[in-house]
Amino acid sequence: IGGAICMAKPLDFAYDAFSVGMGEHIDAISFHEYVIDETVVFRHVKALRGLCNRFNPNIEIIQGESGSQSRSDGRGAMRKGAWTPHKQAKQLLRHLMADLMTEVKFTSYFSCMDMIEALNGTVGDLVSYLDYGYFGVLGADFDAQGRSVGNYTPKPSYYALQTISAIFSEDVQKADLYTGTVPI
């Protein structure tokens, strides 16, 4: 796999890497997609496919990381949305389905549990890096002082992911649905 690309940025880096021969040495390329509107995935995957085709059409595309938070006070990507556990579950389902409708080899969800992002911490100052990202399908349980106690509780997104995983656990083939009208 040849690295991960943040699709919110232009593909200039990937183009430059392919231009100096990277495409000859990789089997797949991964992208990370943190977006509120999952429909942008279609054009981003199409653009990435076009770039790969120019240098090596055999390269597979992997959606290596995406997700959303379940609280609006979290740290990390997409932290400024009015997120709730219900909105997180809906976004998880919409984004996974959008991924599966493209040609990605597989799709990944970030993450299994809420965790410390440690984006602005100072070494030796524990309180400075207790900044949680609430991306998990399992929610961290906190004590009265706001510290994680090491227990995790399933969120609605956990059950959504469990259900969609069960639906697609066997051999599944993508099929185009007819969206036109039947002539009379």
Annotate each PLM feature.
Residues 96-184:
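Aromatic- and carboxylate-lined catalytic core of secreted/periplasmic carbohydrate-active enzymes
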Residues 1-107, 117-119:
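Noncatalytic carbohydrate-binding groove/subsite architecture in carbohydrate-active enzymes
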